[in-house]
Amino acid sequence: MFRLLRWRLGRTLLRAAGRRCGGCTARLLPERTGDAGTGAERLRTRGAPARGHGVLPLLAALAWFSRPAATAEQPGEDASDEAEAEIIQLLKQAKLSIMKDEPEAAELILHDALRLAYESDNRKAITYTYDLMANLAFIRGQLENAEQLFKATMSYLLGGGMKQEDNAIIEISLKLANIYAAQNKQEFALAGYEFCISTLEGKIEREKELAEDIMSEETANTYLLLGMCLDSCARYLLFSKQLSQAQRMYEKALQICQEIQGERHPQTIVLMSDLATTLDAQGHFDDAYIYMQRASDLAREINHPELHMVLSNLAAILIHRERYTQAKEIYQEALKRAELKRDEVSVQHIREELAELSRKSRRLT
């Protein structure tokens, strides 16, 4: 009755992670400075503002899964005994505490749940609780602790007979790769991403041979998991300045998301923005503008929660194309929207960009 958590525990968790661990959140990429095509342009994450007209990548798997995959059973109300019912209630309380950004309370509750799971010898409950504890440690930036907990979760799953290519194992492997990426353990990170991507691609090829006319939910979730792995790998390659490789990964991830989720899905828009960021970093400003303009149009249509960030990115690309007046207008709109969202990080960044743009304009006159 226990389902492993999806990669995202919801947008609230990602926001909480961003507040608590700027460089080691679910977004993972620390601030970086480097030459990007035409000069010293800065690529950085939302959590790490930097001076200069840099594009702000919308990093993270915001909503790859629009619904949970049916890889295991979810905790329900039909607990078979009192101990399991109590464990389920504790896990629900812990998840609620996490969503309310109360990690200390969640940790205490999870330890109680784990104790009960061991006392009742409930292997599924033990596995589920370890996974939730690992996710909590990860979003708090406790990477070494998260690593050990994820490995413990994987050990329990494999020990219970789960196959190595099961989506749940791939998700944990992806989380471990992201931890290694945050720790700048390049060899381990890239090996982890390669394992996840190659395993899923092989799995999808085998499933194609048995494919029916209508894609099953399980197959769709496998595609989405592959897209999430490509997305994560692309972010790390972008951070590592392997820009052309990052571009290819983003292109594949975007194609998957468009096909499965649709062009208007929030995650599709995020990927368009990230791909534009990567193109911009290589000096491909015209191509970057096409993707970012489309992303901003779609973000307006669906009232995307991070429209202000897309607009900020669009303005940065307009500056690179020397369209300063239009860039200023877009930045001003982005600033108003960021203030309404009370996104202090973006507000600070956009104000700095506007100030820099003003100085640049004075030098040109």
UniProtKB/Swiss-Prot annotation:
PROSITE patterns reported in the protein's UniProt record: TPR_REGION
Modification after translation (UniProt): Proteolytically cleaved by PARL.
SUPFAM superfamilies assigned: TPR-like (SSF48452)
Gene Ontology terms: biological process: mitochondrial respiratory chain complex III assembly
Transit peptide extent on chain: 1-52
InterPro entries, A to Z: TPR-like_helical_dom_sf (IPR011990), TPR_rpt (IPR019734), TTC19 (IPR040395)
SMART domains: TPR
Intervals holding TPR repeats: 127-160, 220-260, 269-302, 308-341
Domain of life, per lineage: Eukaryota
Cited Pfam families: TPR_10 (PF13374), TPR_12 (PF13424)
Swiss-Prot/TrEMBL site (Cleavage) positions: 70-71
Localization of this protein: Mitochondrion inner membrane
Phenotype when the gene is knocked out: Mutant mice show progressive neurological and energy metabolic decline, decrease complex III activity, increased production of reactive oxygen species, extensive astrogliosis and accumulation of ubiquitinated proteins in neurons of the thalamus. Compatible with a Mendelian autosomal recessive trait. No evidence of embryonic lethality nor evidence of obvious neuronal loss.
GO cellular component: mitochondrial inner membrane; mitochondrion
Keywords assigned by UniProt, alphabetized: Electron transport, Membrane, Mitochondrion, Mitochondrion inner membrane, Repeat, Respiratory chain, TPR repeat, Transit peptide, Transport
Principal subcellular localisation of the protein: mitochondrion
Protein's job: Required for the preservation of the structural and functional integrity of mitochondrial respiratory complex III by allowing the physiological turnover of the Rieske protein UQCRFS1. Involved in the clearance of UQCRFS1 N-terminal fragments, which are produced upon incorporation into the complex III and whose presence is detrimental for its catalytic activity.
Assembly notes: Binds to the mature mitochondrial complex III dimer, after the incorporation of the Rieske protein UQCRFS1. Interacts with UQCRC1 and UQCRFS1. Interacts with ZFYVE26 and CHMP4B.
Family designation: Belongs to the TTC19 family.
UniProt protein name: Tetratricopeptide repeat protein 19, mitochondrial
Organism, as annotated: Mus musculus
Record lineage: Eukaryota, Metazoa, Chordata, Craniata, Vertebrata
Gene: Ttc19
